[in-house]
């Protein structure tokens, strides 16, 4: 009996030690690469990311430079692979899972950093499973971001078309100019500050939408299910048609020159000037505040 108990104890101890080693990253080694590509040879960048963070930065160089730094769990498999497919650059990050413990992330696994000249490529598309993203002063015709879990911070983006789809994570866009912007969020708050866009549409299932230092534009549409909506204009609009409705919460519209046509418990509509531009705000169970 004592021998059996000792054997069981030894097996449990080995299992605990093995788990601890996995958690602490024992068995993995550091991974770091750097590659550069001449501007003009690459028209589009596609990133398929499993679990690393991603950073985009502007550069004055005439080259696109990609650096990676993180953990390599399998010596035979690089966690990040970069290849060219015609005029498209494809970056794939995948961490080989050695066991059950590797299905869980403990701390930061790694970072992919892309330095790109302004207007260096025509499109960047990111398919992100898990990881945070940061964009700094990128100028590009088209951006398409899809993320399952992770926060996204965008600063100083200049683009003709911007599309952001997020399942779970906060989104912040600051000091950017995006002619046509579409944001679709399931869970997570959306914060847009000093964003210029002639056509903006933001939808959120469970999360607030805040548009600060807003500028009057042709069309701004915001729909939420469970989440408050707040729009604060930098300068008073001159020609704006306003429609706001909420099924279960308060609606406040405080704009200079706003003439109400409907002032009901669940909706407010009205116009400023000729109403050439549109502001449409709809929430099923959130407050609406416009000022």
Predicted feature locations:
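Short acidic/polar N-terminal linker immediately downstream of export determinants
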Residues: 2-10, 14-77, 98-119, 259-275
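Generic detector of contiguous secondary-structure segments
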Residues: 3, 49, 71-84, 228-246
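Right-handed parallel beta-helix
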Residues: 32-40, 80-165, 170-179, 189-191, ...
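Exposed beta-strand and adjacent loop surfaces of beta-rich binding modules
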Residues: 44, 63-65, 79, 121-123, ...
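Active-site alpha-helical segments that house and flank conserved acidic catalytic motifs
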Residues: 45-48, 126, 145, 244
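Solvent-exposed coil/turn segments that connect beta secondary-structure elements
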Residues: 59-61, 69-72, 85-87, 94-96, ...
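Short, surface-exposed interaction patches in beta-rich subdomains
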Residues: 173-176, 180-182, 191-291
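N-terminal glycine-rich phosphate/adenylate-binding segment common to multiple enzyme folds
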Residues: 186
């Amino acid at each position: 009996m004592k021998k059996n108990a000792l054997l069981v104890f030894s097996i449990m101890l080995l299992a605990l030690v093995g788990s601890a080693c996995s958690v602490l990253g024992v068995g993995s080694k550091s991974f770091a690469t750097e590659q550069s590509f001449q501007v003009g040879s690459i028209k589009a960048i596609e990133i398929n990311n499993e679990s690393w963070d991603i950073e985009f930065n502007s550069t004055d160089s005439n080259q696109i430079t990609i650096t990676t730094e993180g953990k390599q769990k399998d010596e035979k498999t690089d966690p990040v692979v970069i290849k060219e497919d015609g005029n498209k650059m494809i970056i794939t990050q995948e961490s080989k899972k050695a066991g059950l413990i590797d299905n869980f992330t403990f701390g930061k696994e790694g970072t992919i950093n892309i330095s790109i000249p302004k207007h260096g490529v025509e499109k960047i598309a990111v398919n992100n499973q898990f990881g945070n993203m940061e964009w700094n002063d990128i100028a590009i015709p088209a951006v398409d971001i899809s993320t399952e879990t992770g926060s996204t911070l965008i600063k100083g983006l200049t683009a003709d078309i911007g599309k952001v789809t997020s399942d779970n994570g906060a989104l912040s866009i600051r000091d950017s100019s995006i002619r046509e912007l579409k944001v679709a969020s399931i869970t997570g708050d959306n914060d847009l500050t000093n964003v210029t866009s002639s056509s903006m549409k933001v939808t959120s299932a469970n999360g607030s939408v805040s548009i600060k230092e807003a500028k009057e534009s042709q069309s701004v549409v915001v729909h939420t299910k469970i989440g408050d909506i707040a729009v604060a204009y930098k300068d008073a609009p001159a020609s704006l048609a306003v429609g706001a409705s909420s099924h279960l919460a308060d609606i406040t519209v405080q704009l200079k020159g706003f003439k109400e046509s409907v002032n009901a418990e669940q909706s407010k509509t009205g116009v400023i000037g000729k109403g050439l531009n549109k502001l449409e705000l709809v929430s099923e169970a959130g407050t609406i505040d416009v000022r």
